[in-house]
């Protein structure tokens, strides 16, 4: 979704798309701590508090601005002549994006995926606010935190669960390190 949005914002430049880019990336400037109480009230009102669906919708909403921003900055480096040659060959805008431009975004896509997955996997505050009341929907980091109590801390369980929580992030980073470096360098 973010890559297609960034493609349209970059290729169809006018005052409306410039305004849309500003509106889409503006939430990156607002710290989560300033909206967390009102967000919790809204999610409780619409019965999404305590559910995995509600948590997923929030992660999706918070991740879109950064992903669009990263894709947009990379799109600016792709020459427009590539689009024009695809149009000459008879491709429409969607085919140009899906068959020509999107394969060029492989390294940036992996970078966005790794950044988002690591952010979601390691996040503590949002799941603590939204799904802490139910044992079925707790994340692994919250489950590790449940071993730390006010008067008693079970360090052996807490440390074992933290190792399990850190392990997937390390494995993902090691496997996709090449793409992460390419994506960060390409977007610079």
Across the structure, where does each feature detected by a protein language model lie?
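A structural signal for multi-pass alpha-helical bundles of membrane permease subunits
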Residues: 1-188
């Amino acid at each position: 979704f973010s890559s297609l949005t960034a493609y349209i914002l970059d290729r169809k430049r006018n005052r409306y798309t410039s305004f849309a880019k500003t509106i889409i990336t503006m939430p990156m400037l607002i710290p989560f701590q300033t909206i967390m109480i009102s967000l919790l009230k809204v999610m409780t009102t619409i019965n999404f508090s305590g559910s995995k669906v509600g948590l997923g919708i929030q992660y999706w909403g918070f991740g879109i601005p950064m992903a669009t921003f990263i894709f947009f900055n990379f799109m600016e480096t792709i020459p427009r002549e590539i689009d024009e040659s695809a149009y000459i060959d008879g491709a429409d805008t969607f085919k140009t994006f899906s068959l020509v431009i999107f394969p060029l975004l492989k390294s940036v896509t992996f970078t966005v995926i790794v950044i988002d997955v690591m952010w979601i996997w390691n996040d503590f505050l949002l799941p603590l606010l939204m799904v802490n009341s139910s044992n079925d929907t707790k994340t692994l980091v919250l489950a590790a935190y449940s071993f730390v109590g006010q008067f008693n801390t079970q360090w052996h369980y807490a440390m074992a669960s933290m190792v399990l929580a850190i392990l997937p992030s390390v494995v993902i980073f090691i496997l996709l390190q090449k793409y992460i470096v390419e994506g960060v360098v390409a977007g610079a």
